[in-house]
Amino acid sequence: MIKIVVGSVSTNVIGILCILLILIGGGLLIGIGIRRELERERQHQRVLERLARRLSIDSGVEEDEEFNWNNFDPHNYNPRDWI
């Protein structure tokens, strides 16, 4: 067991309680900060998903057509392939 030599017992107990209070408070602040950042990240993800859905609905282009258009190579363009 650790023996604390300096000061009285009540002073040592109060000091230990203060240290514990500071550590617990700091841990709570860090936890709250992490929770807020996670919630903010979830909100950003929701906004991006809504935007992607809205853009895909508004464009009127199917995903297969988008895929084919992204693979379009003007140097090897054959109009019969696209009819």
UniProtKB/Swiss-Prot annotation:
GO annotation terms (biological process): monoatomic ion transmembrane transport
PTM section of the record: Phosphorylated by host CK2. This phosphorylation is necessary for interaction with host BRCP and degradation of CD4, but not for enhancement of virion budding.
Keyword match Iron: no
Residues carrying Phosphoserine: 59
Activity regulation as described: Ion channel activity is inhibited by hexamethylene amiloride in vitro.
Positions on the Cytoplasmic side per record topology: 35-83
Primary localisation category: host cell
Residues spanning the membrane: 14-34
Entry membrane topology: Single-pass type I membrane protein
GO cellular component: host cell membrane; membrane
Residue intervals annotated with topology Extracellular: 1-13
Coiled coil: none
Assembly notes: Homopentamer. Interacts with host CD4 and BRTC; these interactions induce proteasomal degradation of CD4. Interacts with host BST2; this interaction leads to the degradation of host BST2. Interacts with host FBXW11. Interacts with host AP1M1; this interaction plays a role in the mistrafficking and subsequent degradation of host BST2. Interacts with host RANBP2; this interaction allows Vpu to down-regulate host BLM sumoylation.
Function: Enhances virion budding, by targeting human CD4 and Tetherin/BST2 to proteasome degradation. Degradation of CD4 prevents any unwanted premature interactions between viral Env and its receptor human CD4 in the endoplasmic reticulum. Degradation of antiretroviral protein Tetherin/BST2 is important for virion budding, as BST2 tethers new viral particles to the host cell membrane. Mechanistically, Vpu bridges either CD4 or BST2 to BTRC, a substrate recognition subunit of the Skp1/Cullin/F-box protein E3 ubiquitin ligase, induces their ubiquitination and subsequent proteasomal degradation.
Domain remarks: The N-terminus and transmembrane domains are required for self-oligomerization and proper virion budding, whereas the cytoplasmic domain is required for CD4 degradation. The cytoplasmic domain is composed of 2 amphipathic alpha helix that form a U-shape.
Identification of the protein by name: Protein Vpu
Annotated organism of origin: Simian immunodeficiency virus (isolate TAN1) (SIV-cpz)
